[in-house]
Amino acid sequence: MLSISKTKMDFLEEGRWKDPFDELLDSRTKLSKMNIVKQNVRVTYNIDSSVENSSYIEIKEPNHKNEPLTLEDCSIKVYCPSDSISTPCDKRLGGTTGLFETDLSPITRLKLEGVEDSRDKCADTNEADLYVNVEILFQNINSSPKKCSNFGKKRLSNLNKMVTAVHPSISLNPGKWRKSLNNFIRSKITETNFTKKVERRSSICQDRKSLVLKGEHKFENKYEEDVLKYCHQCTPLPFNTAYEQHKLLNTKKIGEGAYGEVFRCSRNQEVLKDHISDIVLKIIPLEGSTVINGEKQKTFSQILPEIIITKKMCSLRTSKTNSTNGFVSIQKVSLVKGRYPPHFIKLWEKYDNEKGSENDHPELFGDNQLFAVLELKFAGSDMANFKFLNSEQSYYALQQIILALAVGEEEYQFEHRDLHLGNILIEYTNKKHIVCTFKSSNLTLLSKGVNVTIIDYTLSRVTINDCCYFNDLSRDEELFQATGDYQYDVYRMMRNELKNNWSSFSPKTNIIWLSYVIVKVLDSVKYKSINTKVHRMYIDKIKELKNIIMTFESASHCANYLFNLN
């Protein structure tokens, strides 16, 4: 049996219900009383924030068990940012007010006291050497089944006891899951027998590598060619030339994530008269060997599905049988090469000085660095931060969301699979009506002064030209262990609905997410006027929709009911 000295137990007594991260943030802990200087912990303001300043305390075992702990017995170790994950604050694309402020919420597993984790691989857990190390740890246990821990210092006497990993639930705030989910799979849909299905051409993007199932050793070159094709380019453009300062007006950085940087600007209409004036530039580094923002850079094979899905969902604006403006408009995609332009660096530094950036300084990029730049139409504030006039506005916003999903289902077997409030953008509009086409029928909705846009297809599933694109979440256990908000119940409900087969088309997942959005419209979104008769009347309508939403099998089914369609 592992024994810990009474001195150490006394040290843990006051904070025995707190994890080490809480102790770092609590000024009343014993560490503070010992005058140990803690690192500054920065409150996060960014669109996709993570706990980049997480650390843990290592307590060396005293030479004499009865001697009290001293300052020399403790040291601060900075935890690796690449393994530090958190739920982010809600997205905020623009606006004049300050960005939404959120508490730090680390997403890691808490290691048992007295055990040290390393990244060494071993073939069998029973054959691993087990040791004791007296430490208080805050570490991330890698979810890969091929990796296990190798512990040091004091060997346990009994190796016959079963050692099991404990996966505690993780309490989080609602928002975007920061951890990169690069498990996009493209598979050919075919009705042939099982043998032929195994041999079909497909590729799996996982762990930042392209895993090939059949004869695609040259696929990386083909992915680059495909990206260039969607960019309408033959070769990468010089970064400085493609985005010269005089071509962009009122540029400012509005957010960031592990994927890269987000800038908002206006196009110089004299230079490009046919372009949208108010745009968002999403700049994503590609194919470099340098680890950026704690993660490996995306490959061509990983950025290609995002480009394809974004373009296809945008194309629904002009489709004849099923059309909607409810998905974000992508104006242009560019592949550029070279160092970050100086004017972008100045904007990055201004953002860092005012709000604090968690990303690496873009001066790290060299002359040969590649970037994908997605130019998207600015579409307003996310639903979590938007303030509705009353529930009448939010009710008609719900109708826009339902119809957009229904159109996506009909045209591309679309499932969003991550429709939290940060992925729904809303802006005011002077248009009285929203027009769309559903199953060749023209529909006109009242806008009530708001226009809704759905964004972010990281977890989405679509069928395009007999190919299915989806993100395989079957091995991402951390996502399904999270608690603290209905959002994380929805991920588990999706997994049950799909039976963990993420390639299958099950539009019920859209209904599950609609139930989540309806709950948030009732409980979380902001309203200006809540004491009016109109507000109370439409709150009742939204409650009625909440009571029946789970009876529908798809957004199409729901739209048929709401708009009395056949």
Curated annotation (Swiss-Prot):
Keywords for the protein's UniProt record, in alphabetical order: ATP-binding, Chromosome, Cytoplasm, Cytoskeleton, Kinase, Nucleotide-binding, Nucleus, Phosphoprotein, Serine/threonine-protein kinase, Transferase
Catalytic activity: L-seryl-[protein] + ATP = O-phospho-L-seryl-[protein] + ADP + H(+); L-threonyl-[protein] + ATP = O-phospho-L-threonyl-[protein] + ADP + H(+)
UniProt-listed Enzyme Commission number(s): 2.7.11.1
MF-aspect GO terms: ATP binding; histone H3T3 kinase activity; protein serine kinase activity
GO cellular component, one term: spindle
Null mutant phenotype: Viable, however adults display a decrease in survival which is stronger in females than males, and both sexes display a decrease in fertility. Loss of phosphorylation of histone H3 leading to reduced centromeric cohesion. RNAi-mediated knockdown reduces the size of salivary gland nuclei. Also results in a strong decrease in chromosome-bound pds5 in larval salivary glands and a significant decrease in chromatin-bound vtd in mitotic and interphase embryo cells.
Main location class: nucleus
Signal peptide stretch: none
GO biological process: intracellular signal transduction; mitotic cell cycle; positive regulation of maintenance of mitotic sister chromatid cohesion, centromeric; positive regulation of maintenance of sister chromatid cohesion; positive regulation of protein localization to chromatin; post-translational protein modification; protein phosphorylation
Active site: D418 (proton acceptor)
Coiled coil: none
Group of enzyme by EC: transferase
Keyword match Cytoplasm: yes
Residues covered by the Protein kinase domain: 248-566
SUPFAM superfamilies associated with the record: Protein kinase-like (PK-like)
Keyword Transferase: yes
Binding site for ATP: 254-262, 282, 377-382, 418-423, 456-458
PANTHER family in alphabetical order: INTERLEUKIN-1 RECEPTOR-ASSOCIATED KINASE, SERINE_THREONINE-PROTEIN KINASE HASPIN
Function noted in UniProt: Serine/threonine-protein kinase that phosphorylates histone H3 at 'Thr-4' (H3T3ph) during mitosis and interphase. Function is essential for chromosome organization during mitosis and genome organization in interphase cells, thus playing a functional role in gene regulation. During mitosis, may act through H3T3ph to both position and modulate activation of AURKB and other components of the chromosomal passenger complex (CPC) at centromeres to ensure proper chromatid cohesion, metaphase alignment and normal progression through the cell cycle.
Protein name: Serine/threonine-protein kinase haspin homolog
Gene it is expressed from: Haspin
